[in-house]
């Protein structure tokens, strides 16, 4: 990675109907004038797991090491990766209250995915009219909709 290399922007979002329930994740990737949309869903999950999965898939989708700015509306993801995870690791994946960290599998996967890239993190208020965040939200909901549609039995 060179210092002059343009940054890939990844706008991420997760959604869940029921929490737990069917959930989806969505990512809008932007690199210069190019954009790419990715999304998916899971039958039984939580909103926080889908928020994490969006960030993970954003990083795992990139074919080579990049400078990446991940923009999320999830304080859980942003604070988790930038503030909490180092302490969790030191405590053997326990919270300050000594209970096991939730979603440890996805936190560890996110840490691994992040290592390939030069990542910075940003937060934006969800559902506040930010076009890229709204696009990521639509993608996350498309992930749920397509999952539920695939579950229907043909007439």
UniProtKB/Swiss-Prot annotation:
Chain residues that bind Mg(2+) 1: 13, 51, 73
Binding residues for Mg(2+) 2: 13, 137
Record has Cell membrane as a keyword: no
GO BP terms: DNA replication, removal of RNA primer
Entry GO terms, CC: cytoplasm
Primary localisation category: cytoplasm
Alphabetized Pfam families for the sequence: RNase_H
GO MF term set: magnesium ion binding; nucleic acid binding; RNA-DNA hybrid ribonuclease activity
Keywords: Cytoplasm, Endonuclease, Hydrolase, Magnesium, Metal-binding, Nuclease
Cysteine-cysteine disulfides: none
UniProt-listed Enzyme Commission number(s): 3.1.26.4
NCBIfam families from the UniProt entry: PRK00203.1
HAMAP family: RNase_H
Subunit structure: Monomer.
Primary role: Endonuclease that specifically degrades the RNA of RNA-DNA hybrids.
Protein name (Swiss-Prot/TrEMBL): Ribonuclease H
Originating organism: Methylococcus capsulatus (strain ATCC 33009 / NCIMB 11132 / Bath)
Taxonomy of the source species: Bacteria, Pseudomonadati, Pseudomonadota, Gammaproteobacteria, Methylococcales
Gene: rnhA
